[in-house]
């Protein structure tokens, strides 16, 4: 399933795919404040290939999970977080994760990872790393962002060193979609 705001989702969803160490997190961390400065509220879904722990041993929420709670919602006046324990270890589905987000408070969802899922996405490519391109083997790639000019490219090419250019491209894509 290819996510877009008209057919499957009320808000635009755009993925970023690349090999580990290419700079996906760095790029998204540059794009988000530009969007925010333009009044666009951004949510992010990040795929982790490894175990992670947001909780700390000894804290009440950790103790509740350790005791067997399937979900623990931790809330304060500034933020809240829902810790959910998966009963079955399986790759998460981005569509199911999107259902968990409060889209009434977002204008755009950026997805880091999930490169094999049918999301519209921008490929990050750094030729100096010596890795093969993901396009055309991966579905849904709508543009490529690189730190070097790419020859004979059929997709729109974006400069990784120009985050404002990337924001402009994404805003144009949001309006078309």
Predicted features along the sequence, with ranges:
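Conserved NTP phosphate-binding and transfer environment spanning the P-loop NTPase/kinase superfamily
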Residues: 116, 137-177
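Hydrophobic/aromatic beta-strand patches that form the interior of the parallel beta-sheet core
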Residues: 14, 43-45, 70-73, 122, ...
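Walker A (P-loop) phosphate-binding motif
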Residues: 2-50
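Phosphate-binding/switch loop-helix module in NTP-utilizing enzymes
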Residues: 85-114
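N-terminal phosphate/diphosphate-binding loop that engages ATP/GTP or pyrophosphate donors
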Residues: 32-89
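Conserved C-terminal guanine-recognition region of P-loop GTPase G domains, centered on the G4
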Residues: 115-137
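Short, hydrophobic beta-strand segments that form beta-sheet elements in well-ordered domains
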Residues: 109-111, 121-125, 140-147
């Amino acid at each position: 399933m290819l996510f877009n705001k008209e057919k499957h989702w009320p808000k635009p969803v755009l993925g970023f795919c690349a090999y580990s160490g290419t700079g996906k997190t760095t790029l998204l961390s540059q794009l988000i404040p530009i969007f925010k400065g333009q009044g666009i509220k951004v949510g992010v879904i990040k795929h982790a290939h490894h175990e992670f722990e947001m909780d700390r041993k000894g804290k009440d929420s950790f103790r509740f999970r350790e005791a067997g709670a399937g979900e623990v919602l931790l809330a304060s006046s500034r933020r809240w977080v829902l810790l959910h324990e998966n009963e079955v270890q399986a790759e998460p589905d981005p569509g199911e994760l999107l259902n968990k987000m409060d889209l009434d408070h977002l204008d755009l969802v950026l997805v880091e990872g999930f490169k094999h899922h049918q999301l519209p996405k921008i490929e990050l490519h750094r030729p100096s790393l010596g890795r093969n391109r993901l396009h055309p083997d991966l579905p849904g790639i709508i543009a490529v962002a690189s730190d070097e000019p790419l020859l004979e490219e059929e997709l729109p090419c974006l400069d990784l060193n120009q985050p404002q250019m990337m924001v402009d491209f994404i805003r144009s894509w949001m309006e078309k979609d």
